[in-house]
């Protein structure tokens, strides 16, 4: 009898433990189903379980030491954080609705703090709507479709910095609307049309408003087809094009009633002026 009771108690205990394990497993399944998905590649990617939200996080840092030797003077060294960028991008609700945010923290990016002036931490803050592979519509602050060297990220340059021509003549960033039509094919003639209507005041402008706007239009031609891995967006031929690839582009920019010496950049003008820019680019990779 005692053996029978002991056996029954053992069976009941095993069943109870099994039930506990089953419940615990079910609870874990529920918890796991609520966790986001992680991906790696261009930074750290986080996607919600229902795939309605995606966030990619990455940063970029460039530290620089410079040696200076002028004739008749003692040698000198300088060290600086040339660039420090933090970038967020992804989509909300649907992969057709995207966003991008880029912040900068290096002294050369932020600039000197002055009374009544904004701190230039925000570089990009824009939302995109891409209904298909050809059309893109943008609203917010980001780069204008200007010269190629400026459009390319500073992390995709051939050398450590852009040219002095870019520093003087670029149209840089602005706040407004942009619309792109992209028609790229791998092995045949391709072209892109990019347009923008913006404030013309440059990034992070909060001073007095006016009725002047900036208009930008750009045409890109690729006679031998599109570049591998979006090769127009980085200077070196790291993708190793097996056939010649050529990019010819021209942009026209008119900044009506500009307030600054370089349109979107520079110091304040004594009188508002309308500025016009023509930007031509060519890129060959083979």
What are these regions (language model features)?
Residues 42-203, 208-225:
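Outer membrane beta-barrel
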Residues 8, 22, 65, 194, ...:
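Intrinsic disorder/low-complexity detector
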Residues 31-33, 75, 114, 269-270:
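Intrinsically disordered, low-complexity segments enriched in polar/charged residues with Gly/Pro
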Residues 38, 170-171, 273-274:
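A short catalytic or substrate-binding loop motif that flags glycine-/basic-rich loops and adjacent residues
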